[in-house]
C-alpha cells in the first residue's frame, strides 16, 4: 500500500468524513500538521461532519494482574493482554482540540437471556440534532472503548449515549465504581468550527457485528443530517 494523506483531494467534495482508529500504537502513525490543518479548514465549512472512531486501548497498565483482569473481562482469546489502537486518530483529535481519550476495551451488557446488546442510555434532552432519534442500541462487540471526556466544559462536548457494562467479570473501570461507559459523543459547532464532530466506535458502522433496525436508523440519521 501507500500513504494517502487527508487533503483537498479527499475533502473537497466530502460532507461527512469517517476516520477510524484501528492502527496499532506500535506502528507510530500520526496525522501530519498539514492533514490537521486541512481537516480544520474543512470543518470551517458549514454542513460538514467528522466521525471519529478510535478503537479500544487494552492493557495500558504496567500491572500484569490488571491486564489479566481486563483479558478475563472481555473474554476474547484473540485479543492479547495488551492491544492498543488509534495513535493516528488520537493525534488528529489532539490537533483539532477534541477533549476525548479512548480507554479500555469493555464488554457491553446484554439483554437477559439473549446475546443482544443491552439498550443504550440515551440523553435525548441533550441530543438537539436528533442523532439518536429512533435509536435504542448499537451492535455487540466484546471489547469497546470508553470515550473519556477530559474537559469540564459541557457546552463544548456532550455525551449523548452510554453503554451498560457486563458486570459478570470485574474490570479496573468497574472496580472504580463505573457501570456504564461513554459510547457516543457529540461536539456541536463552536468558534471557527462550523462543522460537527461525532465519536462512535468503528464496529458500530460494520455489518460484521450485526445490523438491526436500530443500527440502520442510526446510519440513516447520520447520512441524512443537514
Per-segment meaning from a language model:
Residues 1-226:
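Short, surface-exposed patches at the edges or C-terminal ends of soluble domains, predominantly
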